Regions:
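FIC/Doc superfamily catalytic core
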Residues: 1-216
Length: 216
């Protein structure tokens, strides 16, 4: 079976401009409505809206990976880092602090150049113990083994996708990072969608690829 990365120039994504632009128009319209509502709120309400939005995004992103974050810990960590006063603040686990740190770097420093080291830093804070589930994984560096997306019981696994070989990952990521930093002609919403698909197609890390892709 051929996977997307087996084709020549696979990273040169093509799309139906008319259909995409219609959808982007709807997205931009809804963004404008949200911005308008935010501007009508007082400063305290704006702060609460920001806290709620980022907190729920982090909680939902982790749920996709089968992890449950404590919402109170996430909100408290965000409030401390953003300098927002909040009643009933609690201490957060090392893992929650790391997830929040990654998300804030991605959202507040979105205009900073992306680099391998920056991605390695995000990966480090996602796995501070170097363990995912029951297994030790390679942290803060690209994977050195194969990567498959599978489902099914042991012995009856179904392979849904096989990522590029580990030997290809550094070059594939160099190309991806260069594109992220250089292509300023594409709509940012569309660029985020392409970046997500491109990144998960490479699957450069032992674990955490989905969470990092959503941060991107």
């Amino acid at each position: 079976m051929l996977y997307i990365h087996d084709y020549d120039n696979w990273w040169k994504f093509r799309y139906d401009s008319l259909r995409v632009m219609n959808e982007l128009g709807r997205v931009r319209s809804k963004q404008g409505m949200i911005i308008g509502r935010m501007l009508s709120l007082g400063f305290d309400s704006q702060d609460n809206a920001v806290l709620s939005n980022i907190s729920m995004e982090l909680v939902r992103s982790s749920e996709i990976e089968g992890e449950k974050l404590n919402l109170g810990e996430v909100r408290s960590s965000l409030a401390r880092r953003l300098g927002i006063a909040m009643a009933g603040m609690v201490s957060a686990s090392r893992y929650v602090e790391g997830v929040v740190e990654m998300q804030l770097d991605a959202t507040q420093n979105y205009n900073h150049p992306l680099s391998a080291d920056r991605l390695f830093g995000w990966h480090n804070v996602l796995f501070p113990t170097g363990i995912s589930g029951l297994y030790r994984i390679e942290v803060g560096k690209y994977r050195s083994g194969e990567m498959q997306v599978i489902s099914g019981a042991m012995g009856k696994e179904k392979i849904h996708y096989q990522a590029p070989s580990a030997e290809r990952v550094p070059a594939e990521m160099d190309r991806f990072i260069s594109w992220v930093n250089s292509d300023e002609t594409i709509d940012t919403v569309l660029k985020a969608a392409i970046a997500h698909l491109w990144f998960v197609s490479i699957h450069p890390f032992d674990d955490g690829n989905g969470r990092i892709a959503r941060a991107l």
